[in-house]
From Swiss-Prot:
Organism: Bacillus velezensis (strain DSM 23117 / BGSC 10A6 / LMG 26770 / FZB42)
Chemical reaction(s) catalysed: (2R,3S)-3-isopropylmalate = (2S)-2-isopropylmalate
Superkingdom of this protein's organism: Bacteria
Family: Belongs to the LeuD family. LeuD type 1 subfamily.
GO CC annotations on file: 3-isopropylmalate dehydratase complex
Gene3D superfamilies recorded: Aconitase, domain 4
Protein name per its UniProtKB record: 3-isopropylmalate dehydratase small subunit
Lineage of the organism: Bacteria, Bacillati, Bacillota, Bacilli, Bacillales
Gene from which this protein is expressed: leuD
EC number: 4.2.1.33
Length: 199
């Protein structure tokens, strides 16, 4: 995975609560075996009209949000089934960071595992931030190393992140590469450990 230390990008607001994984990536698109190419199906039922044209009423179709890489989402984002296709779709759409008051736990972990940074933010702080970026074409900088958000007004907002996931993102590790880094330690442990087959 690509390391994520500091990211600057346009922020888009999707102020809807309880957005579930079926709304993020509908089930009819889960038959693919690749991890890429899901971006065009993200939010499909909201994003497109029945004739296949983009729905101008859907928030993320607004011109001001074109090219956004930071999503300011509503409470309980990513609830529903545990499908890993949801973060795949959001990542392929172009989002690298998601800021919300709360996330479904499995979705939250799946974001980290797929190189995305989900940031939990107290509701009052989130409400101010969402209001600032609502219907605006504004950038934001997220500094993961120092755990700071720099908004469009130059204000700093601190955030919490689990040290394990922080290290994974900053170094671009996935679970396999992290295991390989610990290969010597694992082998040393195994060499000292008696086989359960031994009497």
């Amino acid at each position: 995975m690509e390391p994520l230390k500091t990211h600057t990008g346009k922020a888009a607001v999707l102020n809807r609560i309880n957005v579930d994984t079926d709304q993020i990536i509908p089930k009819q698109f889960l038959k693919r075996i690749e991890r890429t190419g899901y971006g065009r199906f993200a939010f499909f039922d909201w994003r497109y009209l029945e004739n296949g044209e983009p729905d101008p009423e859907f928030e993320l179709n607004r011109k001001v949000y074109e090219g956004a890489s930071i999503l300011i989402a509503g409470e309980n984002f990513g609830c529903g089934s545990s499908r890993e296709h949801a973060p795949w779709a959001l990542d392929d759409y172009g989002f690298k960071i998601i800021i919300a008051p709360s996330f479904a736990d499995i979705f939250h972990q799946n974001c980290f595992k797929n190189g995305m940074l989900p940031i939990r933010m107290p509701y009052d702080q989130w409400k101010k931030l969402a209001g600032q970026y609502e219907n605006q074409s504004l950038n934001m900088t997220v500094d993961l190393e120092n755990q700071l958000i720099h908004d469009s007004e130059g204000k700093e907002i601190s955030f919490e992140v689990d040290p394990h996931w922080k290290e994974m993102l900053i170094n671009g590790y996935d679970e396999i590469s992290l295991t390989l880094l610990l290969e010597d330690d694992i082998q040393q442990f195994e060499s000292k450990r008696s086989s359960w087959l031994q009497a």
